[in-house]
A protein has these predicted regions:
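Acyl-CoA thioester-binding alpha/beta core of soluble enzymes
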Residues: 14-21, 54, 75-76
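Long, charge-rich, low-complexity alpha-helical segments
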Residues: 36-83
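Hydrophobic packing positions characteristic
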Residues: 1-15
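Short, Lys/Arg-enriched anionic-surface-contact patches
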Residues: 17-38, 81-82
Length: 83
């Protein structure tokens, strides 16, 4: 279900993700999980780096279901970009 980047940074356009928001002046206006200060890209980078969902959840204090939803969005977007 989820894709791990193979030596490459996963680039995601979070603008259509329902659980991500951009708040000017909050975390420098980067995409964050709604209601948090956790950067969406940080979750993906941790996963791409080999961290399991349970570990990411514990480290960031975000429910595993939310982590999976975020990673699923990123994977679907990446699959649309693949030739």
């Amino acid at each position: 279900m989820f894709m791990r980047a193979q030596g490459k940074k996963t680039v995601v356009d979070w603008s259509d993700c329902p659980i991500v928001e951009v708040v000017p002046g909050k975390v420098s206006g980067v995409p964050i999980l709604k209601g948090t200060r956790v950067q969406a890209d940080s979750i993906v980078e941790n996963f791409d780096g080999g961290s399991p969902v349970a570990e990411i959840s514990a480290n960031f204090g975000i429910p595993e279901t939310t982590i999976r939803e975020l990673l699923g969005f990123a994977a679907r977007q990446q699959s649309r970009l693949q030739p």
